């Protein structure tokens, strides 16, 4: 996230009424324009009309009041006794003091079911969990639909991530500041002199008439510009980094003045639109599920091109069970080595896929190869296991990248990196792009992903046996209006639509992070979650 926005969530945690906005981290940011039709496992529209008359809201919106009005209950058609395999329907609504429905349409909820287990793994208590599908009926009521996937006492958990009013602030902010929520720099070091220039996806942000270096690449769907320095060629190598807060390259206050932040802070706080993941209470909050049919029976082998259902899996005793296909679990290093023997893996994207590289290197005890002037955060990274002939590569997707200084000659746009891979039956390509694009309009992300998709199509044409894996976005802190789950999920929806029907694998990191309840949300998921993602990846490399 831009360090500028960090002031909104400083260590002092400035209060908004009775709520507090929690701290965030610099590497997440967010903003976007209108999304495609919003149909997903959290919220999607439905045309059903409730029987009871709906009262239009006329009073100014108050988050504190709305939070107290929201509740949930079992749908009238729900059973009293439940068995594994049944569907559970939960109605979410808000009632005013006269018991009329409050019509707040377009809220962003999060729904899951969970069971906390007594068994602990290490010092961490883990349990069972699965997501629910939210339907927005466009009349102030919502339905959360769950599939009951294990027996025992099951707790229903509903959270309000963003009320519609907070989403409006997000979208309004993006329309007003479409490309300047985060700024970047190119740095030249000439002898003892250091020269910084501003960079971004649109030269209009520079607001001057000086010359511009155009590093855009239409083939890669990438737009990138930097201010031109007099007497320095645009082809001169330098360093890429994120612009620090409140300082432009000339030492001034830059775009994000204190006045701008105060105005934004006032709008967020005193409009009652601070965005926290607020728990919604209801009754019953727990149900008892009896033994039923074997949910995991009759799963097929993990092969490319399988459709990912809205509920794609669940945790049981802290272990991920896929509903897509029969997924693997490894109990030893030898199991991983046997699966990956002779394979070359190419990971490309942001730091959430770099975690794959890091954990495979740790699990396999691989030897990292030093690449001159490469930095860990952006790569390129290379590790090798000579005994089992396993090679794992990782590199960033190119700018925009919110990072510390990294050499520009090491940066490569994702589509171009994919085009350099020969492919083959022993090659695995893993891709994810999302975390560094939340601060831009959807069109910027769309152009980049269209180029990545075209590169994947070219790769599969020249080498159909190459395994291509797309890792979705994952849930993160979600407590910020500028960088929460709403923006990431909009990008994720677009990514899923782009790769729909292609001969690729989807690793649903969104659901795997959303369904668990024993870690706090974090843009970088915990180690056990990453291992589950990698085990699912390996289920396609060496299927059962």
Predicted regions and their residues:
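A compositional signature for long Ser/Thr(±Pro)-rich, low-complexity
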Residues: 1-143, 147-461, 465-544
């Amino acid at each position: 996230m831009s360090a500028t926005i960090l002031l909104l969530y400083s260590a002092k945690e400035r209060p908004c009424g009775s709520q507090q906005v929690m701290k965030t981290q610099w590497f997440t940011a967010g903003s976007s324009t209108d999304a495609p039709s919003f149909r997903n496992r959290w919220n999607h529209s439905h045309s059903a009309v409730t029987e009871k008359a709906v009262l239009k809201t006329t009073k100014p919106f108050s988050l504190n009041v709305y939070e107290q009005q929201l509740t949930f209950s079992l749908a009238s058609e729900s059973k009293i006794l439940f068995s594994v395999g049944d569907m559970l329907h939960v109605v979410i609504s808000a009632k005013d003091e006269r018991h009329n429905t409050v019509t707040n349409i377009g809220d962003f909820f999060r729904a899951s079911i969970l069971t906390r287990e007594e068994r602990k793994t290490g010092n961490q208590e883990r349990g069972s969990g699965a997501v629910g599908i939210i339907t927005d009926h466009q009349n102030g009521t919502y339905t959360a639909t769950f599939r009951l996937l294990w027996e025992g006492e099951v707790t229903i958990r509903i959270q309000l991530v963003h009320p519609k009013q907070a989403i409006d602030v997000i979208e309004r902010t993006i329309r007003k500041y479409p490309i300047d929520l985060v700024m970047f720099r190119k740095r030249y070091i000439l002898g003892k002199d250091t020269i910084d220039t501003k960079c971004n996806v649109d030269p209009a942000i520079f607001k001057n008439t000086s010359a511009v270096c155009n590093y855009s690449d239409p083939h890669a769907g990438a737009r990138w510009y930097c201010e031109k320095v007099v007497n320095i060629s645009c082809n001169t190598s330098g360093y890429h980094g994120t612009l620090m807060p409140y300082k432009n390259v000339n030492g001034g206050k830059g775009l994000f003045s204190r006045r701008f932040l105060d105005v934004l802070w006032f709008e967020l706080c005193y409009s009652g639109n601070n965005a926290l993941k607020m728990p919604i209470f209801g009754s019953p909050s727990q149900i008892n599920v009896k033994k039923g049919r074997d949910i995991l029976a009759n799963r097929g082998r993990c092969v490319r091109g399988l459709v990912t259902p809205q509920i794609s899996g669940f945790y049981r005793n802290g272990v991920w069970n896929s509903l897509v296909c029969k997924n693997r679990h490894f109990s030893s290093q030898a199991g991983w080595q046997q699966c990956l023997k002779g394979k070359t893996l190419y990971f490309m994207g942001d730091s959430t896929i770099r975690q794959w590289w890091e954990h495979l290197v740790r699990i396999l005890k691989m030897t990292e190869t030093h690449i001159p002037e490469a930095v860990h955060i952006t790569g390129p990274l290379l590790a090798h296991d000579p005994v089992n002939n396993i090679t794992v590569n990782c590199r960033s997707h190119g700018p925009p990248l919110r990072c510390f200084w990294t050499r520009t000659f090491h940066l490569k746009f994702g589509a171009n990196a994919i085009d350099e891979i020969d492919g083959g039956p022993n090659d695995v390509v893993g891709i994810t792009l999302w975390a560094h694009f939340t601060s831009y309009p959807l069109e910027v992300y769309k152009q980049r992903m269209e180029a990545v998709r075209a590169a994947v199509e070219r790769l599969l044409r020249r080498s159909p046996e190459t395994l291509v894996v797309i890792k979705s976005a994952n849930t993160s802190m979600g407590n910020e209006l500028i960088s929460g789950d709403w923006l990431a999920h909009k990008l994720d929806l677009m990514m899923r639509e782009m790769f729909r029907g292609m001969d690729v694998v989807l690793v649903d990191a969104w659901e795997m992070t959303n369904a668990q309840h024993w870690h706090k949300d974090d843009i970088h998921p915990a180690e056990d979650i990453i291992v589950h993602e990698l085990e699912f990846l390996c289920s396609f490399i060496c299927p059962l």
